[in-house]
Amino acid sequence: MMNNLFSVFDPSTSSNFNLNWLSLFILMTIAPFSFWASSSLFLISWKSLLKKFFQEISNNIKLSKMKNCLIISSIFIFILLSNVMGLLPYVFTSSSHLVFTMFLAFPFWMTFILFSLINKFNMVMAHLVPMGSPMALSFFMVIIETVSNIIRPITLSVRLTANMISGHLLIHLLSSISMFSNLLFMVSIPFMMILLILETAVAFIQGFVFVILISLYINES
């Protein structure tokens, strides 16, 4: 059993290099496999899943902003593959680090904010005070709305990171307990299988939630 539970999230492989981050480049070889792989049940299921996802995103985005669907779908695939790859043995979980999730969330948020301020400045200022708010509370409403807009990339990043960390910690704890005896090892096997299935579902759900929130932010811009 490891002395530090969070050592599994350490990207360092030596004192000078963080080679674990190179696992992100594996996605470049996995993602375009449909261009050279022959049709199979897995490939057909994968394409059907992406088609359903693209339709869901299209329903949440205004017609004038449909050109953003492609980049949102790409972000979803990237996050999903990163989350699922982190469940494999000896593979570094990049999505469990804030530096990774902030790298995805902050540019989107900053782009939408700048676009709205440049093209729809009056509308942005008007949205800081919800319709029907008393005049006496308008100052506080502006502060609340401003803070809520500022923390959006933080909430996006922390939500994804926290869910990935919690799931991997549970898997690590359960696998560490199973090392004490053969009986615990046999008992923990079905629980480990169930937990891995749940974590796979969480990997999909968290990637979906991430891009759905981004699509909602696009509609507001």
Swiss-Prot record:
Subcellular location: Mitochondrion inner membrane
Membrane topology term: Multi-pass membrane protein
Name of protein: ATP synthase subunit a
Residue spans crossing the bilayer: 24-44, 69-89, 98-118, 124-144, 169-189, 194-214
Keywords from the UniProt entry: ATP synthesis, CF(0), Hydrogen ion transport, Ion transport, Membrane, Mitochondrion, Mitochondrion inner membrane, Transmembrane, Transmembrane helix, Transport
Description of how the protein assembles with itself and partners: F-type ATPases have 2 components, CF(1) - the catalytic core - and CF(0) - the membrane proton channel. CF(1) has five subunits: alpha(3), beta(3), gamma(1), delta(1), epsilon(1). CF(0) has three main subunits: a, b and c.
Highest taxon of source: Eukaryota
